[in-house]
Amino acid sequence: MGDYLVKALGFEGKVRAYALKATEMVNEAVRRQDTWPTASAALGRTMMAGTMMAAMLKGDAKLTVKVEGDGPIGAIIVDSQANGQTRGYVKNPHVHFELNEHGKLDVARAVGTNGSLSVVKDIGLRDHFTGSVPLVSGELGEDFTYYFVSSEQTPSSVGVGVLVNPDNSVLAAGGFVLQLMPGADDAIISEIEKRLQTIPPISKLVEAGMPPEEILAALLGDDNVKILEKMPIEFACQCSKERIARAIISLGKDEIRAMIEEDGGAETTCHFCNEVYLFSKEELETLYEEA
Protein backbone atom coordinates (compact mmCIF):
# COMPACT_ATOMS: atom_id res chain seq x y z
CA MET A 1 0.00 0.00 0.00
CA GLY A 2 1.17 3.53 -0.69
CA ASP A 3 1.59 6.35 1.80
CA TYR A 4 -1.26 6.95 4.22
CA LEU A 5 -2.15 8.48 7.56
CA VAL A 6 -4.21 6.99 10.38
CA LYS A 7 -6.31 8.97 12.86
CA ALA A 8 -7.15 7.18 16.10
CA LEU A 9 -8.19 7.52 19.72
CA GLY A 10 -6.45 5.79 22.60
CA PHE A 11 -7.41 4.92 26.15
CA GLU A 12 -11.16 5.40 25.50
CA GLY A 13 -10.79 8.83 24.00
CA LYS A 14 -8.30 10.24 26.47
CA VAL A 15 -5.49 10.23 23.88
CA ARG A 16 -5.70 11.50 20.31
CA ALA A 17 -3.25 9.77 17.98
CA TYR A 18 -1.96 10.12 14.44
CA ALA A 19 0.59 8.03 12.56
CA LEU A 20 1.74 7.96 8.97
CA LYS A 21 3.93 6.21 6.46
CA ALA A 22 5.30 8.87 4.11
CA THR A 23 8.22 7.26 2.28
CA GLU A 24 6.96 8.07 -1.22
CA MET A 25 5.80 11.58 -0.30
CA VAL A 26 9.18 12.51 1.16
CA ASN A 27 11.06 10.81 -1.65
CA GLU A 28 9.16 12.84 -4.25
CA ALA A 29 10.12 16.08 -2.46
CA VAL A 30 13.74 14.91 -2.21
CA ARG A 31 13.79 14.03 -5.91
CA ARG A 32 12.36 17.38 -6.99
CA GLN A 33 14.54 19.41 -4.61
CA ASP A 34 17.72 17.36 -5.16
CA THR A 35 18.36 17.48 -1.42
CA TRP A 36 21.40 15.86 0.17
CA PRO A 37 20.78 13.36 3.01
CA THR A 38 20.83 15.64 6.07
CA ALA A 39 18.68 18.23 4.29
CA SER A 40 16.39 15.39 3.14
CA ALA A 41 15.85 14.29 6.73
CA ALA A 42 15.10 17.85 7.87
CA LEU A 43 12.67 18.46 5.02
CA GLY A 44 10.99 15.07 5.45
CA ARG A 45 10.54 15.46 9.21
CA THR A 46 8.95 18.89 8.72
CA MET A 47 6.68 17.66 5.91
CA MET A 48 5.41 14.76 8.01
CA ALA A 49 4.75 16.96 11.04
CA GLY A 50 2.89 19.43 8.81
CA THR A 51 0.86 16.61 7.24
CA MET A 52 -0.25 15.31 10.64
CA MET A 53 -1.06 18.81 11.90
CA ALA A 54 -3.17 19.48 8.79
CA ALA A 55 -5.00 16.19 9.35
CA MET A 56 -6.32 17.72 12.58
CA LEU A 57 -8.13 20.35 10.48
CA LYS A 58 -11.36 19.91 8.53
CA GLY A 59 -12.68 20.49 5.01
CA ASP A 60 -10.61 22.79 2.82
CA ALA A 61 -8.45 24.03 5.69
CA LYS A 62 -4.69 24.22 5.23
CA LEU A 63 -1.58 25.35 7.06
CA THR A 64 1.94 26.53 6.46
CA VAL A 65 4.89 25.52 8.64
CA LYS A 66 8.06 27.58 8.61
CA VAL A 67 11.24 26.51 10.39
CA GLU A 68 13.90 29.20 10.51
CA GLY A 69 17.07 28.15 12.29
CA ASP A 70 20.61 29.50 12.23
CA GLY A 71 21.98 26.39 10.49
CA PRO A 72 23.23 26.15 6.90
CA ILE A 73 20.03 24.79 5.31
CA GLY A 74 18.17 28.03 5.99
CA ALA A 75 14.39 28.11 6.07
CA ILE A 76 12.17 25.05 5.62
CA ILE A 77 8.70 25.84 4.27
CA VAL A 78 5.87 23.30 4.18
CA ASP A 79 2.28 23.71 2.96
CA SER A 80 -0.14 20.99 4.06
CA GLN A 81 -3.84 20.57 3.38
CA ALA A 82 -6.47 18.73 5.42
CA ASN A 83 -6.99 16.39 2.45
CA GLY A 84 -3.51 14.87 2.82
CA GLN A 85 -1.68 16.83 0.14
CA THR A 86 1.65 18.37 1.18
CA ARG A 87 4.51 20.18 -0.49
CA GLY A 88 7.74 21.53 0.98
CA TYR A 89 11.13 22.95 0.22
CA VAL A 90 14.35 23.85 1.95
CA LYS A 91 16.27 26.99 1.05
CA ASN A 92 19.68 25.32 0.77
CA PRO A 93 19.14 21.68 -0.29
CA HIS A 94 22.82 20.76 -0.69
CA VAL A 95 23.72 20.30 2.98
CA HIS A 96 25.06 17.09 4.49
CA PHE A 97 27.11 16.21 7.59
CA GLU A 98 28.59 13.07 9.05
CA LEU A 99 26.29 11.11 11.37
CA ASN A 100 25.97 12.46 14.91
CA GLU A 101 27.09 10.63 18.05
CA HIS A 102 23.83 8.63 18.03
CA GLY A 103 24.53 7.34 14.53
CA LYS A 104 21.75 9.44 13.01
CA LEU A 105 21.67 12.19 10.40
CA ASP A 106 22.70 15.41 12.15
CA VAL A 107 19.50 17.38 11.52
CA ALA A 108 20.07 19.74 14.45
CA ARG A 109 23.40 20.86 12.99
CA ALA A 110 21.78 21.50 9.61
CA VAL A 111 18.73 23.32 11.00
CA GLY A 112 20.47 25.11 13.85
CA THR A 113 19.41 25.36 17.47
CA ASN A 114 18.55 29.06 17.53
CA GLY A 115 15.54 30.24 15.61
CA SER A 116 11.80 29.71 15.42
CA LEU A 117 9.06 27.33 14.34
CA SER A 118 5.87 29.03 13.19
CA VAL A 119 2.53 27.68 11.99
CA VAL A 120 -0.14 29.63 10.11
CA LYS A 121 -3.54 27.91 9.87
CA ASP A 122 -6.09 28.94 7.24
CA ILE A 123 -9.45 27.47 8.26
CA GLY A 124 -11.51 29.62 5.91
CA LEU A 125 -12.08 32.54 8.24
CA ARG A 126 -10.95 36.09 7.58
CA ASP A 127 -8.21 35.93 10.20
CA HIS A 128 -5.62 33.16 10.17
CA PHE A 129 -4.38 31.48 13.33
CA THR A 130 -0.64 32.02 13.81
CA GLY A 131 1.54 30.40 16.45
CA SER A 132 5.30 30.65 16.88
CA VAL A 133 7.80 29.18 19.32
CA PRO A 134 11.60 29.25 19.60
CA LEU A 135 13.47 26.14 18.50
CA VAL A 136 14.42 23.94 21.43
CA SER A 137 16.71 21.38 19.75
CA GLY A 138 16.65 21.69 15.95
CA GLU A 139 15.92 17.94 15.71
CA LEU A 140 12.35 18.97 14.79
CA GLY A 141 10.38 16.21 16.55
CA GLU A 142 11.15 17.84 19.89
CA ASP A 143 10.48 21.27 18.40
CA PHE A 144 6.99 20.28 17.22
CA THR A 145 6.34 18.68 20.62
CA TYR A 146 7.22 22.00 22.26
CA TYR A 147 5.04 23.87 19.75
CA PHE A 148 1.94 21.85 20.70
CA VAL A 149 2.56 22.29 24.42
CA SER A 150 3.49 25.98 24.30
CA SER A 151 1.38 27.40 21.47
CA GLU A 152 -1.68 25.15 21.55
CA GLN A 153 -1.58 24.12 25.24
CA THR A 154 -1.86 20.44 24.29
CA PRO A 155 0.55 18.01 25.98
CA SER A 156 1.92 16.00 23.07
CA SER A 157 4.68 13.74 21.83
CA VAL A 158 5.87 14.00 18.22
CA GLY A 159 8.14 11.49 16.53
CA VAL A 160 9.32 11.88 12.93
CA GLY A 161 12.10 9.99 11.18
CA VAL A 162 13.66 9.59 7.74
CA LEU A 163 16.15 6.95 6.55
CA VAL A 164 18.14 7.85 3.43
CA ASN A 165 19.72 5.38 0.99
CA PRO A 166 23.35 5.71 -0.20
CA ASP A 167 22.00 7.01 -3.55
CA ASN A 168 20.18 9.83 -1.67
CA SER A 169 16.72 8.34 -2.22
CA VAL A 170 14.46 7.82 0.80
CA LEU A 171 14.44 4.32 2.28
CA ALA A 172 11.76 4.93 4.90
CA ALA A 173 9.87 7.87 6.40
CA GLY A 174 7.23 7.86 9.11
CA GLY A 175 5.89 9.75 12.07
CA PHE A 176 3.40 9.94 14.91
CA VAL A 177 1.69 12.50 17.12
CA LEU A 178 0.18 11.56 20.48
CA GLN A 179 -1.90 14.17 22.32
CA LEU A 180 -3.37 14.00 25.80
CA MET A 181 -7.02 14.98 26.06
CA PRO A 182 -8.74 16.22 29.24
CA GLY A 183 -9.17 13.30 31.61
CA ALA A 184 -5.88 11.60 30.83
CA ASP A 185 -4.54 10.57 34.24
CA ASP A 186 -1.05 9.83 35.54
CA ALA A 187 -1.40 6.10 34.86
CA ILE A 188 -2.02 6.75 31.15
CA ILE A 189 0.85 9.22 30.99
CA SER A 190 3.32 6.84 32.64
CA GLU A 191 2.22 3.96 30.36
CA ILE A 192 2.82 6.06 27.24
CA GLU A 193 6.14 7.39 28.55
CA LYS A 194 7.31 3.84 29.25
CA ARG A 195 6.45 2.75 25.71
CA LEU A 196 8.07 5.83 24.15
CA GLN A 197 11.34 5.03 25.92
CA THR A 198 11.50 1.47 24.62
CA ILE A 199 10.12 1.72 21.07
CA PRO A 200 12.69 1.67 18.22
CA PRO A 201 13.07 4.78 16.01
CA ILE A 202 9.94 5.20 13.90
CA SER A 203 11.88 5.21 10.62
CA LYS A 204 13.22 1.75 11.53
CA LEU A 205 9.66 0.52 12.15
CA VAL A 206 8.55 1.79 8.75
CA GLU A 207 11.61 0.21 7.12
CA ALA A 208 10.66 -3.11 8.75
CA GLY A 209 7.22 -2.86 7.13
CA MET A 210 5.21 -1.95 10.23
CA PRO A 211 2.06 -0.06 9.13
CA PRO A 212 0.81 3.07 10.96
CA GLU A 213 -1.92 1.09 12.76
CA GLU A 214 0.65 -1.25 14.30
CA ILE A 215 2.91 1.67 15.20
CA LEU A 216 0.05 3.19 17.21
CA ALA A 217 -0.60 -0.19 18.85
CA ALA A 218 3.07 -0.33 19.86
CA LEU A 219 2.85 3.21 21.27
CA LEU A 220 -0.45 2.83 23.12
CA GLY A 221 -1.05 -0.91 23.56
CA ASP A 222 -3.07 -3.27 21.33
CA ASP A 223 -6.27 -2.91 23.32
CA ASN A 224 -6.06 0.87 23.65
CA VAL A 225 -6.37 1.95 20.01
CA LYS A 226 -9.59 2.77 18.17
CA ILE A 227 -8.93 3.60 14.48
CA LEU A 228 -11.16 6.44 13.28
CA GLU A 229 -9.98 7.03 9.74
CA LYS A 230 -7.33 6.17 7.15
CA MET A 231 -6.48 8.69 4.45
CA PRO A 232 -3.98 8.68 1.58
CA ILE A 233 -1.24 11.32 1.66
CA GLU A 234 0.97 12.56 -1.16
CA PHE A 235 3.38 15.22 -2.34
CA ALA A 236 1.26 17.63 -4.39
CA CYS A 237 1.98 21.14 -5.63
CA GLN A 238 -0.79 23.58 -6.47
CA CYS A 239 1.31 25.66 -8.84
CA SER A 240 0.12 26.20 -12.43
CA LYS A 241 0.87 28.48 -15.35
CA GLU A 242 -2.40 30.32 -14.65
CA ARG A 243 -1.40 30.97 -11.05
CA ILE A 244 2.04 32.22 -12.11
CA ALA A 245 0.37 34.45 -14.72
CA ARG A 246 -1.79 36.04 -12.02
CA ALA A 247 1.35 36.69 -9.99
CA ILE A 248 3.00 38.38 -13.00
CA ILE A 249 -0.10 40.55 -13.55
CA SER A 250 0.08 41.64 -9.90
CA LEU A 251 3.60 43.04 -10.52
CA GLY A 252 2.09 45.85 -12.61
CA LYS A 253 2.60 47.22 -16.11
CA ASP A 254 6.07 48.70 -15.53
CA GLU A 255 7.57 45.38 -14.38
CA ILE A 256 5.93 43.47 -17.22
CA ARG A 257 7.11 46.02 -19.79
CA ALA A 258 10.67 45.61 -18.48
CA MET A 259 10.40 41.82 -18.90
CA ILE A 260 9.26 42.29 -22.49
CA GLU A 261 11.86 44.86 -23.51
CA GLU A 262 14.88 43.65 -21.52
CA ASP A 263 14.40 39.88 -21.52
CA GLY A 264 12.00 39.23 -24.38
CA GLY A 265 10.08 36.81 -22.17
CA ALA A 266 10.02 35.39 -18.65
CA GLU A 267 11.05 32.17 -16.94
CA THR A 268 10.07 31.26 -13.41
CA THR A 269 10.62 28.14 -11.31
CA CYS A 270 8.33 26.93 -8.52
CA HIS A 271 10.24 26.71 -5.21
CA PHE A 272 8.28 23.66 -4.12
CA CYS A 273 8.28 21.35 -7.15
CA ASN A 274 10.97 22.90 -9.39
CA GLU A 275 8.55 23.04 -12.31
CA VAL A 276 9.73 25.65 -14.84
CA TYR A 277 7.19 27.99 -16.45
CA LEU A 278 8.05 29.93 -19.60
CA PHE A 279 6.20 33.01 -20.87
CA SER A 280 6.84 34.22 -24.41
CA LYS A 281 6.97 37.87 -25.40
CA GLU A 282 3.46 37.51 -26.85
CA GLU A 283 2.10 35.99 -23.64
CA LEU A 284 3.61 38.83 -21.63
CA GLU A 285 1.99 41.36 -23.97
CA THR A 286 -1.39 39.78 -23.16
CA LEU A 287 -0.65 39.91 -19.41
CA TYR A 288 0.45 43.54 -19.81
CA GLU A 289 -2.99 44.41 -21.19
CA GLU A 290 -4.64 42.72 -18.19
CA ALA A 291 -2.43 44.42 -15.59
From Swiss-Prot:
Keywords: Chaperone, Cytoplasm, Disulfide bond, Redox-active center, Zinc. One of its GO terms (biological process) is protein refolding. InterPro entries: Heat_shock_Hsp33, Heat_shock_Hsp33_C, Heat_shock_Hsp33_N. Pfam families: HSP33. Gene3D superfamilies: Hsp33 domain (3.55.30.10), HSP33 redox switch-like (3.90.1280.10). Under oxidizing conditions two disulfide bonds are formed involving the reactive cysteines. Under reducing conditions zinc is bound to the reactive cysteines and the protein is inactive. CDD domains: Hsp33. The keyword Cytoplasm applies. One of its GO terms (molecular function) is protein folding chaperone. Disulfide bonds join C237-C239, C270-C273. SUPFAM superfamilies: Hsp33 domain, HSP33 redox switch-like. Belongs to the HSP33 family. Redox regulated molecular chaperone. Protects both thermally unfolding and oxidatively damaged proteins from irreversible aggregation. Plays an important role in the bacterial defense system toward oxidative stress. This is 33 kDa chaperonin. It comes from Halalkalibacterium halodurans (strain ATCC BAA-125 / DSM 18197 / FERM 7344 / JCM 9153 / C-125).
